[in-house]
Structures are given as C-alpha cells and as structure tokens.
Amino acid sequence: MAAKKGKKTSTKKSDYYKVEGNTVERLKKVCPKCGAGVFMAEHLNRFACGKCGYLEYKKNEKAESEE
C-alpha cells in the first residue's frame, strides 16, 4: 500500500497585507479583471493572474536606457 501524503500547507494570507494603525496596504499587485482579493503572481519579467490568466509584462529598464 502507498504511503499517505502529508497535509498540504497553504500560503499565509497575512503575508500579502501590511497594517499600520487604521490603514491596510496590499503588498502584491491586484488583478484588474478579477478585482480586489485576487493577487497576481510576480515572475521575472511579468505579473500573472492564476484565476483568469491575465498577463502584464514588466517594462524592460535596460532596453529603455540604451535607446
């Protein structure tokens, strides 16, 4: 019989917010299509939404400075 898999750990949602006094600040980018509550994953050259698949590419600062 196969060994049982361990329980999968989820990410802590509290890592996505910063609380200062009475204000709450989101630390990650929010998907413009899905709205508040759906954060976008940050990759090397883009931001991606895992829910709807929306992509937003980062500006290449090296290419802009060379022009």
Swiss-Prot record:
Q: Which GO terms describe its cellular component?
A: ribonucleoprotein complex; ribosome
Which GO terms fall under biological process for this protein? translation
Q: Which cofactor does it need?
A: Zn(2+)
Renumbered zinc finger spans (C4-type): 31-52
**Cross-referenced Pfam families:** Ribosomal_S27 (PF01599)
* Keyword annotations from UniProtKB, A to Z: Metal-binding, Ribonucleoprotein, Ribosomal protein, Zinc, Zinc-finger
Q: NCBIfam families annotated for this entry?
A: PRK00432.1
State what protein this is by name.
Answer: Small ribosomal subunit protein eS31
Q: Which gene encodes it?
A: rps27ae
